Structure formats: C-alpha cells, structure tokens
Amino acid sequence: MTKFSSFSLFFLIVGAYMTHVCFNMEIIGGKEVSPHSRPFMASIQYGGHHVCGGVLIDPQWVLTAAHCQYRFTKGQSPTVVLGAHSLSKNEASKQTLEIKKFIPFSRVTSDPQSNDIMLVKLQTAAKLNKHVKMLHIRSKTSLRSGTKCKVTGWGATDPDSLRPSDTLREVTVTVLSRKLCNSQSYYNGDPFITKDMVCAGDAKGQKDSCKGDSGGPLICKGVFHAIVSGGHECGVATKPGIYTLLTKKYQTWIKSNLVPPHTN
C-alpha cells in the first residue's frame, strides 16, 4: 500500500488543521432504514471497524471525504464493505473489497476544508446485484435554502457517544443559506462556507450528521447533491452539518478519473 503511506504525513497535518472541527460525522435524530434499501452505501473500515461512509458511483470506485484517509496509519490495510445493513452481523449480501488507492481532490492540499472529497479505487470491481448498486451523480443545480434532504450513515445516535450505530440510519435535514452559515452567530467564517460547500441541519438542533459518517451522501428530492464533510459539535442548531457540494468542477474531476474506468 505505497500510495497509502505516501499520504500519511499530509493527512496527519490536515488532521491537525481540522481538530477544532467535528470531521467524522454520524447521524443524530434519525431512524433505521429498511434493510438494504440504500444499496449504494459503503462502509470504509480497518480492522473490521467502521471509519467513514462512502457512495458506490462505479463498480470499482467509491466517493467519500478526503479527510477520512488521515485516520489510517502506516501498515494498516483499509477495506470497503458493500451490501451491508448491520455492521456486526454476518450478512450474505456483504462484499468486502480491498482498496487499491486513494485519490483526493488535487487542490485539497491548498484548501482542505473546501475540497474535502476523495475517490477510492477498489482492488477489484464490486458485483452489482439487488443489495449492491451504484448511485449516479446527476446534480446540475445548486441547492436552495429550505430544501429538505436526507443523510444516511452508520453513525452514533447520541452526540455524546463515540459508538457507531450497528444498523444503517437516515435523517432529514434542511439546507441553510451560505449567508446564514457564515454569519457571526453560526460559523462566522470558521470554516468559511464556499460555493463548493453547503450546510444543512435542524432549527432545533435535533437532526444532524456528526461523528462516523463522513463521506456519506446528501440526497435531495432523489438527487445525489453532496457528501458529508464536517461541522462543529453535533446536533447544535447554530452549528449545522457541512457538506461538499458536487459542483461542476468536482464532477469533471470525477469523470476524468473514471474514464476510461478500469485502465489505471
């Protein structure tokens, strides 16, 4: 895993830069989904432990958050688990695949908070079936304030707990304007929510993404619009979840890596 070790120092630096921000998201205030009803979901793991979420966008590619990589240390062999509902049960639908390489967005080094997106290439292609399916990126417009969206993940249901949920859960959040998110009473520019980011949460702070589900999808009206990135604390109304918006520049970058899809 030479590719993995070559990034270890960089992501330790990025990790230190992001320590004041909760960048390992989970689901707060949601409910368990029907088993295998979200067949595009991926669990990125090491040693059998869930680290981050992800989305299968091609049989050999998973989309996730770039900061997830710094959680691995030299010598570890991370894997991707597809077709799961329960993390602990021995489900016949599960496929555990080795990771060939991580490809963070090219400008993540210069601006890690606003370019928190990464491709994960699998060693072998996933076998698509009713439990393992791709989620295509079709987002063409920005998200308007007030839009209702769903976030899915295996994160903890209690913001004070570090234990992930054993089963896949989902919560509905509301998109907030960048002006509000960057205001003094919200994030006050730390981090600054750019046009490549969006924040979403709940007016009462009871619904949020928080620890353990970074890289999972934000789906609005059936369209895959963004991935979970971070946020201060968990379930706090004035510190809503932060998401990397799948803007044109990211979609172009993704396509450039996937086409031709299996020759790298």
Swiss-Prot record:
<dbReference type="GO" id="GO:0005615">
    <property type="term" value="C:extracellular space"/>
</dbReference>
<feature type="active site" description="Charge relay system">
    <location>
        <position position="67"/>
    </location>
</feature>
<feature type="disulfide bond">
    <location>
        <begin position="181"/>
        <end position="199"/>
    </location>
</feature>
<dbReference type="InterPro" id="IPR001314">
    <property type="entry name" value="Peptidase_S1A"/>
</dbReference>
<keyword id="KW-0732">Signal</keyword>
<feature type="domain" description="Peptidase S1">
    <location>
        <begin position="27"/>
        <end position="259"/>
    </location>
</feature>
<dbReference type="InterPro" id="IPR033116">
    <property type="entry name" value="TRYPSIN_SER"/>
</dbReference>
<keyword id="KW-0865">Zymogen</keyword>
<keyword id="KW-0378">Hydrolase</keyword>
<protein>
    <recommendedName>
        <fullName>Granzyme K</fullName>
        <ecNumber>3.4.21.-</ecNumber>
    </recommendedName>
</protein>
<dbReference type="InterPro" id="IPR009003">
    <property type="entry name" value="Peptidase_S1_PA"/>
</dbReference>
<feature type="disulfide bond">
    <location>
        <begin position="52"/>
        <end position="68"/>
    </location>
</feature>
<feature type="signal peptide">
    <location>
        <begin position="1"/>
        <end position="24"/>
    </location>
</feature>
<keyword id="KW-0720">Serine protease</keyword>
<dbReference type="GO" id="GO:0008236">
    <property type="term" value="F:serine-type peptidase activity"/>
</dbReference>
<keyword id="KW-0645">Protease</keyword>
<feature type="disulfide bond">
    <location>
        <begin position="210"/>
        <end position="234"/>
    </location>
</feature>
<feature type="active site" description="Charge relay system">
    <location>
        <position position="116"/>
    </location>
</feature>
<dbReference type="InterPro" id="IPR043504">
    <property type="entry name" value="Peptidase_S1_PA_chymotrypsin"/>
</dbReference>
<feature type="disulfide bond">
    <location>
        <begin position="149"/>
        <end position="220"/>
    </location>
</feature>
<keyword id="KW-1015">Disulfide bond</keyword>
<dbReference type="Pfam" id="PF00089">
    <property type="entry name" value="Trypsin"/>
</dbReference>
<dbReference type="InterPro" id="IPR018114">
    <property type="entry name" value="TRYPSIN_HIS"/>
</dbReference>
<feature type="propeptide" description="Activation peptide">
    <location>
        <begin position="25"/>
        <end position="26"/>
    </location>
</feature>
<keyword id="KW-0964">Secreted</keyword>
<dbReference type="GO" id="GO:0004252">
    <property type="term" value="F:serine-type endopeptidase activity"/>
</dbReference>
<dbReference type="GO" id="GO:0006508">
    <property type="term" value="P:proteolysis"/>
</dbReference>
<feature type="active site" description="Charge relay system">
    <location>
        <position position="214"/>
    </location>
</feature>
<dbReference type="InterPro" id="IPR001254">
    <property type="entry name" value="Trypsin_dom"/>
</dbReference>
<dbReference type="GO" id="GO:0140507">
    <property type="term" value="P:granzyme-mediated programmed cell death signaling pathway"/>
</dbReference>
<dbReference type="GO" id="GO:0051604">
    <property type="term" value="P:protein maturation"/>
</dbReference>
<comment type="similarity">
    <text>Belongs to the peptidase S1 family. Granzyme subfamily.</text>
</comment>
